Amino acid sequence: MGRMHAPGKGISSSALPYRRTPPSWLKTTSEEVVEQIVKLARKGLTPSQIGVTLRNSHGIPQVRFVTGNKILRILKSQGLGPSIPEDLWHLIKKAVAVRKHMETNRKDKDSKFRLILIESRIHRLARYYKTKQQIPPTFKYDSATASTLIA
């Protein structure tokens, strides 16, 4: 899929293995993986950070192949899912950082332009998540209250 505010085509990606079964060398059971996911989530890690930690530290290549469910589904079933989706959260965090930069650097025109692009991405993504019912229909991004959302 192409980029929204850049000319790049975005065709580079990693190739997932065709076999959907866990590797034969992996001795970890599904229950142990779920326990590790819950433990890492209680520490405050995001779903993508949990996936990276499991891959790098515990040698679990794909959680979905081992457990049959994705990390986010496991977290939601345990009641530990994030209140707003991770990609929207990171965009809001970036917008707050740029807005803080704009307070001290008022003449920075490029940052002002980039902030407009970031906020348009936030509005578009929020509209998508409202239709998918992953955020409440009353959710509205407001730059004044955005810092409380990511705190």
Curated annotation (Swiss-Prot):
GO terms for molecular function: small ribosomal subunit rRNA binding; structural constituent of ribosome. InterPro entries: Ribosomal_uS15, Ribosomal_uS15_arc_euk, Ribosomal_uS15_N, uS15_NS1_RNA-bd_sf. GO terms for biological process: translation. Gene3D superfamilies: 4.10.860.130, S15/NS1, RNA-binding. It comes from the Eukaryota. The keyword Ribosomal protein applies. One of its GO terms (cellular component) is nucleolus. Pfam families: Ribosomal_S13_N, Ribosomal_S15. Keywords: Ribonucleoprotein, Ribosomal protein. Belongs to the universal ribosomal protein uS15 family. This is Small ribosomal subunit protein uS15. The lineage of its organism: Eukaryota, Fungi, Dikarya, Basidiomycota, Agaricomycotina.
